[in-house]
Amino acid sequence: MFCIQCEQTIRTPAGNGCSYSQGMCGKLAATSDLQDLLIYMLQGVSVYAVKAREQGIIDAEIDSFVPKAFFSTLTNVNFDDERIMAYAQQAAKYRTQLKASYEAACEQAGIVAEQVPQVAQLVLGTSKVEMLAQAPIALLNKDKHNVHEDIMGLRLLCLYGLKGAAAYMEHARVLGQTDADVAGRFHEIMSFLGEPSVDGDKLFTTAMDIGQLNYRIMAMLDAGETQAFGHPEPTVVNTKSVKGKAILVSGHDMKDLELILEQTVGKGINVFTHGEMLPALAYPAFKKYPHLVGNYGSAWQNQQQEFANFPGAVVMTSNCIIDPNVGSYSDRIFTRSIVGWPGVVHIEGDDFSAVIDKALVLEGFIYDEIPHTITIGFARNALMAAAPAVVENVKSGAIKHFFLVGGCDGDKADRSYFTELAKSTPKDSLILTLGCGKYKFNKLEFGDINGIPRLLDVGQCNDAYSAIQLAIALAEVFECNINELPLSLVLSWFEQKAIVVLLTLLSLGVKNMRTGPTPPAFLTANLAKILEEKFGLRNTTTVEADLKTMLNVA
């Protein structure tokens, strides 16, 4: 086992990364090894997808499968060995299919089929024992003694960034948004990473390419969500419990929420969002469901307590899931799509009757709590609608600075930095937030500036796209570039979606960002120095010191 993809990975003087019997996330060594083998098989599929494209062969089904299966290897997504093995076996079938199509096309064209690298040649074992025996060939640091640590760090930066992009591709696909050119570029990068490179410049360029690719993917996802559900609008949301039977929907998948809402109409069941599903309450399409009553709980790391206390059924539509046995709710939590946990019921297809039946036999909330409301829904259209008022307030001096504070949440104590930062921002500044990092401060009162709320909840982590659009619009109005705006970006990271959002911002030329609370363990000190020199990217320090720098206070 070797896994170093998330913020909570083991860090020791002897080396970084989870490499024992179990990762810090609870992932067993066998699960980690099977995930590595799955990635290896997917890279082999991409090798042939690239070759097939050269002969004019595009398979949309395979284009969708590879990022979806890749998504299953993200932090806190799939811990079910059987499901991971099934993905690997399907990858082997697709690779064989593409190989045959490619070779047939070459024969028809009168050309010789090209040799493929080792990553596209592995004959996958048929049992778990055989697959685990093959896993060393796919170990991410298998050649660590032969390559410089900076090269290893760049490889992992690319791999983990592409994982994040794959997740957004799958979210977009569910909403009907696919793009053959995007899929083709994705396969090219997967294929490249399947042949471990020692070219630092090429790897760095690839990391930026992944960022550019993800910008296109975020635009696709934005289009998918807004076309399906309308543009989010400022919305007041209750965060307390409501009497009645209950279902809690966590993850990121708006389509699953819609299916659950449709199937619970008239059933006497209240539906709550959780975590990154909170932004759903701002979409017009969901407001026709009076039984979508609010948001329950906070970010992913608190779920073992929050789900244990929730008196209904829980659905995990995507990341992040952690051990449901700790809170003794494994019999009433359901996984969906790429999510998996051994022994937990997995919902296939679009029928959520098992979830509904479970909710109906559970007690539900026995009384209404006194409501506590927050305001959400400041995504792209709402931000653009507010832009003229924002510009006038900037010109008048009422608004002097913008902060984007968001990203992933986590359970480390030093993440209190983000709470204190938000609380310490000047009263003449606006705070944009997104991702589950918002839960560090989104229930606090920040007031407004001439009717403009000081705290603007942009949405999910992928809604960084909306914040980028606002920054571009403001830069155009003030005839400057983004880096000349009075704008400070402070990103909390935990896993691979945050990594690819960071790469996206860097690829767009955004500079002087801060990330925290700790730097990725796979980034060497030398790589961190290069990123600081090239982009001004640095780690958070103290709220007082960082604010002075961001506000240019001597």
Swiss-Prot record:
Catalytic reaction annotation: A + NH4(+) + H2O = hydroxylamine + AH2 + H(+)
Binding-site residues for [2Fe-2S] cluster, renumbered to this chain: 3, 6, 18, 25
GO biological process, one term: response to hydrogen peroxide
Pfam families named among the record's database cross-references: Prismane (PF03063)
Major location category of this protein: cytoplasm
Organismal lineage: Bacteria, Pseudomonadati, Pseudomonadota, Gammaproteobacteria, Alteromonadales
GO molecular function, one term: 2 iron, 2 sulfur cluster binding
Role of this protein: Catalyzes the reduction of hydroxylamine to form NH(3) and H(2)O.
Keyword set includes Oxidoreductase: yes
SUPFAM superfamilies on file: Prismane protein-like
Keyword terms, alphabetized: 2Fe-2S, Cytoplasm, Iron, Iron-sulfur, Metal-binding, Oxidoreductase
Chain segments annotated as transmembrane: none
Oxidoreductase found in the keyword field: yes
Residue positions binding hybrid [4Fe-2O-2S] cluster: 252, 276, 320, 408, 436, 461, 495, 497
EC number of the protein: 1.7.99.1
Cellular compartments per GO CC: cytoplasm
Gene3D superfamilies: 1.20.1270.20, 3.40.50.2030
Required cofactor(s): [2Fe-2S] cluster; hybrid [4Fe-2O-2S] cluster
Protein's recorded name: Hydroxylamine reductase
Cellular localization per UniProt: Cytoplasm
Entry's cofactor comment: Binds 1 [2Fe-2S] cluster. Binds 1 hybrid [4Fe-2O-2S] cluster.
Cysteine persulfide modification, residue list: 408
Family stated for the protein in its record: Belongs to the HCP family.
